[in-house]
Amino acid sequence: MKVFGAQTDSWQDLLAHILKTQYGISPLPELARTKEGKPYFPSLPALQFTISHSKGHVLCALSRRPVGVDIEEIRPRRESLPRYALSPGEYADYEALGADWPAFYTLWTRKEAWCKYTGQGLAPLWGQTPPEDGLFSRSYQGDGWRAAVFGEEEPPKEVTWLEGEWE
C-alpha cells in the first residue's frame, strides 16, 4: 500500500502523476464507478485506489487490495455532531482523546476510510464501529487536518507528500 498527499484542487492530476511515476502508467486510464459510487479502473483490476480531498488537500491510497482513505480539515461544527456521528464505542474513544475537534476528526476520518474501503458508502454503516480484526488502519495528522487509511495491507507510517514538482 502507498499513500500520497498534495496540496492541490485536482485529484485527477495527482492520480495521473502517481500512476506515471510509481507504476509507469500514462495517460490516466478510464475511470468507472461501482453502483455505490466507488471509483476504479476497469482496465487495471489488480490496482485499487481511493481518493479524498478537503480544502486544498488531496490524499490518494493505492493497493493491490481494497483500500479506503479520508482527509478532513479540522473545523468546529455543531456541538452535538460527535454524539450523532460516532458509534457509542467511538464516542467513548472521543471522550478519552479529549473530546475536542481534533479528536473527533481523528475518529471520523477512520470511519470514513473504513466506509470507502467497504465500497458501501457511509449510510449502511452509520452507527457502526470499524472492525479491528484482520484489517489495518492508520491515522495521520498535520497542521489543521486529520486523515486515515483503512485496508487489508499495512499502511505506511507516513504520507508521502508531493510538492510542486508534479504539477
Stretches with model-predicted labels:
Residues 1-167:
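Core catalytic alpha/beta fold that binds nucleotide/phospho-ligands
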